[in-house]
Amino acid sequence: MKASMFLALAGLVLLFVVGYASESEEKEFPRELLSKIFAVDDFKGEERGCKGFGDSCTPGKNECCPNYACSSKHKWCKVNLGK
């Protein structure tokens, strides 16, 4: 039952995309649509001045972002709970 509902929904979505693509004047629409669906986050490539949650760090160097602290036991940035 669940599989048939999923297939019906997927078929409707596919029908909508194909119908919209056929009405589109641009011939690059399917490629453009796929690139937007599977786009990679651009901000992940940017470097920060500090390290976020789970990044490796050296205790005592204050490398972690605000609200994070370098764990001396595990040597990675974790949430600073004020202890």
From Swiss-Prot:
Which molecular-function annotations from GO does this UniProt entry contain?
ion channel inhibitor activity; sodium channel regulator activity; toxin activity
Concerning its family, UniProt says: Belongs to the neurotoxin 10 (Hwtx-1) family. 15 (Hntx-3) subfamily.
Keywords in alphabetical order, please.
Amidation, Disulfide bond, Ion channel impairing toxin, Knottin, Neurotoxin, Presynaptic neurotoxin, Secreted, Signal, Toxin, Voltage-gated sodium channel impairing toxin
Where is it located?
A: Secreted
Q: What is this protein called?
A: Mu-theraphotoxin-Hhn2i
User: Does this UniProt record's set of keywords contain Secreted?
Assistant: yes
Q: Which Pfam families match?
A: Toxin_12 (PF07740)
Main subcellular localisation: secreted
Q: PROSITE patterns, from UniProt?
A: HWTX_1
* Species of origin: Cyriopagopus hainanus
Q: Which InterPro entries match?
A: Huwentoxin-1 (IPR011696), Huwentoxin_CS1 (IPR013140)
Q: What superkingdom does the record give?
A: Eukaryota
What does the record note on quaternary structure? Monomer.
Can the keyword Disulfide bond be found in this entry's annotation?
yes
The entry's note on the tissues where this protein occurs is: Expressed by the venom gland.
Residue positions where Leucine amide is found in the record: 81
